């Protein structure tokens, strides 16, 4: 899947105009890759545990331009579209969900 958030309205408009994401999945998890034009600027790694998508790592190769937020937003949208709950494990994702209370209903409870 490929998203260009510059074409979206509202909550995603803060990102660099040419930034796009691509989601790749396997049976056990996947990754979200962020591109600024042709340049890879970040990635997010996630795993599946039943109906829970666990955000394990977020890497931004360019800081301060919204790469991390773009990655978490993209995986959040993916989880919603698949009916999955989200477990933010990496510290960036934990803080992102704290700052976006409108998505609290998608969060899985930690056991």
Regions found by a protein language model. Give the residues of each.
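Short, Lys/Arg-enriched N-terminal segments with co-localized hydrophobic residues
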Residues: 2-18
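Short helix-onset patch at the extreme N-terminus, typifying the N->h transition
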Residues: 7-8, 24-27
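Core catalytic alpha/beta fold that binds nucleotide/phospho-ligands
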Residues: 20-22
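A conserved beta-strand-loop-helix scaffold within acyl/acetyltransferase catalytic domains
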Residues: 26-30, 36-52
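Conserved acetyl-CoA-binding loop-helix of GNAT-fold acetyltransferases
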Residues: 65-77
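C-terminal structural segments of small proteins and small subunits
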Residues: 78-111
